């Protein structure tokens, strides 16, 4: 894809257009981990509802990268209020909840431009802390964020309920 790519701030009205990019990211996550993930349609319904709720609450910040009016990437940030009890995040901090870039433009700087837009918006808000979660096994994402000065702070572990007749504990 060689078209000019633009990055612009968007609102709740753009959320429906994010479905293909979210599902591509969700499927990518499925390829990284051997853990149960929510089915695609259910995952999108839940994610869309979450995004729209955050917009309704005035807590969402969305940037969309587009080529010829077609979204090829997006970054969605959610604001959190209240101090963290472990890290000095201040009373208000941001979480990059989703960064997704279409496979056909990966490596072309789209993710960097989206994160630049996020960083500029955060600078306008007094440069609050930014928290980012990365799916286990996503070494490319870890390298990308490390180049941007983001460092690991904690590891999130899951234990899923045992299914009938199955033992979830390792042997």
Model-predicted segments: where are they?
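Conserved N-terminal entry element of GNAT/NAT acetyltransferase domains
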Residues: 1-16, 24, 165-171
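Conserved beta-strand in the GNAT
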Residues: 64, 70-79, 95, 100
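Conserved acetyl-CoA binding element of GNAT-fold acetyltransferases
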Residues: 87-103, 158
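A short helix-loop-beta-strand connector motif used in the catalytic cores of GNAT acetyltransferases and
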Residues: 49-64, 95
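Conserved GNAT-fold acetyl-CoA-binding loop/helix
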Residues: 27-50
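Conserved beta-strand-loop-alpha-helix junction that forms the acyl-donor binding cleft
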Residues: 103-106, 118, 131-141, 158-163
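Conserved acetyl-CoA-binding loop of GNAT-fold acetyltransferases
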Residues: 145-155
């Amino acid at each position: 894809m060689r078209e000019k790519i633009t990055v612009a701030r968007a609102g709740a009205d753009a959320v429906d257009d994010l479905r293909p990019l979210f599902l591509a990211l969700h499927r990518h996550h499925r390829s990284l981990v051997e853990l149960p993930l929510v089915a695609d349609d259910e995952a999108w319904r839940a994610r869309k509802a979450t995004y729209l709720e955050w917009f309704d609450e005035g807590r969402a910040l969305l940037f969309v990268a587009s080529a010829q009016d077609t979204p090829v990437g997006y970054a969605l940030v959610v604001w959190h209020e209240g101090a963290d009890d472990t890290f000095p995040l201040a009373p208000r901090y941001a979480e990059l909840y989703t960064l997704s870039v279409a496979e056909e433009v990966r490596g072309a700087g789209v993710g960097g431009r989206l994160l630049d837009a996020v960083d500029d918006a955060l600078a306008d808000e007094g440069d609050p802390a930014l928290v980012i979660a990365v799916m286990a096994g996503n070494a490319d994402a870890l390298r990308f964020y490390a180049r941007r000065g983001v460092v690991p702070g904690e590891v999130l572990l899951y234990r899923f309920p045992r299914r009938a007749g199955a033992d979830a504990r390792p042997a």
